Amino acid sequence: MFTDLLHSSYFSLFLIVALGFMLGRIKIKGLSLDVSAVIFIALLFGHFGVIIPKELGNFGLVLFIFTIGIQAGPGFFDSFRSKGKTLILITMLIICSACLTAVGLKYAFDIDTPSVVGLIAGALTSTPGLAVAIDSTHSPLASIAYGIAYPFGVIGVILFVKLLPKIMRVNLDQEARRLEIERRGQFPELGTCIYRVTNASVFNRSLMQINARAMTGAVISRLKHKDEISIPTAHTVLHEGDYIQAVGSEESLNQLSVLIGEREEGELPLDKTQEIESLLLTKKDMINKQLGDLNLQKNFGCTVTRVRRSGIDLSPSPDLALKFGDKLMVVGEKEGIKGVARLLGNNAKKLSDTDFFPIAMGIVLGVLFGKLNISFSDTLSFSPGLTGGVLMVALVLSAVGKTGPIIWSMSGPANQLLRQLGLLLFLAEVGTSAGKNLVATFQESGLLMFGVGAAITVVPMLVAVIVGRLVFKINILDLLGTITGGMTSTPGLAAADSMVDSNIPSVAYATVYPIAMVFLILFIQVISSAVY
């Protein structure tokens, strides 16, 4: 009966997942496999003939990659601009060192070219690479070599990623917190203080004439004239002895002091008719609109003092493009704030709702894009493939944010759930597929081909660590993402993802993966045609 159940793919799938989680929770000297343990259980089941359908694996793969891209999209382009050149250079070193290792060992052990390109594709777990290897060599030896190198290509990257922080004695959680503080430093913390108008050059001049926001970056949120407190407009006139309250970074507040007058600590109390509220942007029509275009002061008599996005307070400049889920701190009279709330949406439930149409449409577009075949010449062509197509489309859609009524984003809990589900399906299928031929390939081909494949897997990662840490001084979270992306290893990314509560590895992975995929395909084609 149990044997019959094992032939049921859905029973085997959930049994593999359950046993994988049990194994993943076992810690030895503080090291555990976490979700990566699923693939080891799957390898064992695959050896005994259990099969998970390929379609389930592909379904899981597109879910996992799409959720990675949707989350990483906005950070991807920022990362590409700030440190993209360094990460791409390390990625090129990974691909080059893998191919040079393979070619060197080919001549050392007299291995045929089809087997070498198959070993490269397997060691870097690249199915598009295998397709190119078979197409370029017209030999079944490429797929056999791929099967030999693939299991260690999966397991080796997972173990390397798990062990690297221990070997380097780096606490990933502490490193993530340090990088978060560093990131926040790029967006200075906003403060509030009051000023007494003592600079004669601003007496009897309006805020529009003074142009304080453009000159200092600070936002003037309240004014006290005589004993009356109000929310200033562009036409509000300053008088000697007035008090104003402003919000901004320490630098902008200091600059405002030079412009206005004496700086004092404290806050001006709100008038009884005024309130301050935190409002959520959840209305589709408002996404990507600039804050200044809303004319909140003119239309509602309200002022935005700060915008909170992804845990960071942003200065509410007029050209700030609003994003879904932004939290705006608004000051104004009660009725005015109600009007702003209606304009923005302010519906917390919408943040947790999951709209499956953007997910389905995004994956469809990604799969179609992956089918494109870009020809550079009669002998050289490139196709993004399933993984590359879905990832690149998800990155672009996430960065765009909104197309007409469609919002290309997901709530955090929904993203994590779909990502974990996709990953488990993918690992279970990949593991059983690799496990069924594991022993047979060892018996037929011996340890030589396996050893060469293992070297092609390990050497590039060592090169990346040495160059990345010693030459470029890259933090370990970016390095883990770059290694897994450069090795085109989705299971490796999953291992890194499970070790730390940060999306830094995912952003680095998304930054370099498309580059790695293109270079790997080009190198395999060159080796297939030029190396004998």
Curated annotation (Swiss-Prot):
GO cellular component: plasma membrane
Name of a matching Pfam family: Asp-Al_Ex
Recorded superkingdom: Bacteria
Transmembrane stretches, start-end: 7-26, 30-52, 59-77, 87-109, 116-134, 139-161, 356-376, 386-408, 421-440, 445-467, 474-496, 506-528
Membrane topology (UniProt): Multi-pass membrane protein
Family to which this protein belongs: Belongs to the AAE transporter (TC 2.A.81) family.
Name of the protein this chain belongs to: Uncharacterized transporter BT_0500
Organism (species): Bacteroides thetaiotaomicron (strain ATCC 29148 / DSM 2079 / JCM 5827 / CCUG 10774 / NCTC 10582 / VPI-5482 / E50)
